[in-house]
């Protein structure tokens, strides 16, 4: 298995160093649900601004304030504790009376707005996130500037970030131990984290191998292609390669890589043979995913940050803004810009 730090770069290894998250204000995340509250219903959507507290902690505090069980408060995704983040929480509070959430007080947390909603907010039910990052002590401004320009055109690898694998790779190590011993894992959270780490690591490896090709965005026979921004995909055939390549170049279509699991992977012929070869030695993790009935899926191989802009405060400090779809990692963008000694594993997805 390729170590995360050794995964192939799309733009080559960065020439300079820098600091990510010298303080929480250097990492700002604003959640984009992609819809507005209904204005009625048995649930209440609450938009919060937080700094220094994790999502679950705030959700539990909100449940206590509303005098409801903690399981009645949900959210679309975990947001980093050591960052400034805006996100929505959802509390099930039936009845016509609206609680006064302006009275909710928690250090490091502020209620920005709230409204009634018809449906529970479920994990993953968001469109994406807007990021504002500040990189400090940048040692090579020219290199970072050119990389930002290149990313606008070519994107970055859509790797799962180090945070998916746990601090020190603990989630992936747990998956490997589980695969080797076949001992039942009763803890639902551990099961989820370990299985997610296993398929994410296999996906990263397949993408890393594909990036070693001279033209990483070259459509090959049997590739599974996805309409940009959609989940559905179809298989490329030899007769269509020229037209499909044009649409990939226009970023209308995206080449995908497999999230291994049970069932067919989706690719065929040349593309399938390539994916199978890329993870041929990782039989234990593949067997684990099949055994635990984790279904195979597809994910775009490259990621194109939307609304990408940047501003140099001085020669060693740059503020970068961009929007990413749900499930993608800001740290995968930063990785293509600078070498940093910071540990990404503590940054929530």
Swiss-Prot record:
Its EC number is 5.4.99.27. It is an enzyme of class 5 (isomerase). InterPro entries: PsdUridine_synth_cat_dom_sf, PsdUridine_synth_TruD, PsdUridine_synth_TruD_CS, PsdUridine_synth_TruD_insert, TruD_catalytic, TruD_insert_sf, TruD_pseudoU_synthase. It holds the Pfam family TruD. Residues 155-303 form the TRUD domain. The active site is at 80 (nucleophile). Substrate binds at residues 27, 129, 329. The keyword Cytoplasm does not apply. Keywords: Isomerase, tRNA processing. It comes from the Bacteria. One of its GO terms (biological process) is tRNA pseudouridine synthesis. GO terms for molecular function: RNA binding; tRNA pseudouridine(13) synthase activity. GO terms for cellular component: cytosol. It catalyses: uridine(13) in tRNA = pseudouridine(13) in tRNA. Responsible for synthesis of pseudouridine from uracil-13 in transfer RNAs. Belongs to the pseudouridine synthase TruD family. This is tRNA pseudouridine synthase D. It comes from Escherichia coli O81 (strain ED1a). The gene is truD.
């Amino acid at each position: 298995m390729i170590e995360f730090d050794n995964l192939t770069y799309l733009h080559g290894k960065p020439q300079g160093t820098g600091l990510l998250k010298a303080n929480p204000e250097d990492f700002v995340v604003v959640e984009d649900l992609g819809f507005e509250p209904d204005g009625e219903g048995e649930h209440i959507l609450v938009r919060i601004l937080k700094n220094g507290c994790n999502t679950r902690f705030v959700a539990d505090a909100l449940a206590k304030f509303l005098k409801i069980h903690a399981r009645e408060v949900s959210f679309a995704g975990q947001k980093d504790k050591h960052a400034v983040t805006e996100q929505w929480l959802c509390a099930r509070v039936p009845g016509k009376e609206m609680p006064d959430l302006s009275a909710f007080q928690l250090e490091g947390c502020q209620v920005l707005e709230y409204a009634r909603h018809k449906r529970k907010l479920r994990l993953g039910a968001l469109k994406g996130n807007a990021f504002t990052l500040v990189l400090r002590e940048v040692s090579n401004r020219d290199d970072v500037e050119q990389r930002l320009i290149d990313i606008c055109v070519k994107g970055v690898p859509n790797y799962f970030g180090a945070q998916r694998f746990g601090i020190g790779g603990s989630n992936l190590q747990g998956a490997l131990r589980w695969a080797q011993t076949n001992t039942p894992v009763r803890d639902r959270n551990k099961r989820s984290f370990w299985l997610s780490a296993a398929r994410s690591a296999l996906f990263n490896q397949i993408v890393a191998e594909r990036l070693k090709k001279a033209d990483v965005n070259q459509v090959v026979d049997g590739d599974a292609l996805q309409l940009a921004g959609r989940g559905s995909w179809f298989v490329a055939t030899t007769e269509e390669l020229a037209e499909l390549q044009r649409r990939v170049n226009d970023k209308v279509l995206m080449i995908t890589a497999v999230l291994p699991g049970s069932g067919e992977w989706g690719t065929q012929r040349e593309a399938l043979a390539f994916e199978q070869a890329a993870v041929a030695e990782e039989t234990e993790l593949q067997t684990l995913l099949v055994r635990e009935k984790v279904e195979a899926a597809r994910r775009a191989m490259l990621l194109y940050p939307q609304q990408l802009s940047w501003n140099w405060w001085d020669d060693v400090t740059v503020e970068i803004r961009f929007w990413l779809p749900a499930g993608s990692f800001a740290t995968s963008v930063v990785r293509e810009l600078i070498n940093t000694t910071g540990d990404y594993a503590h940054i929530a997805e």
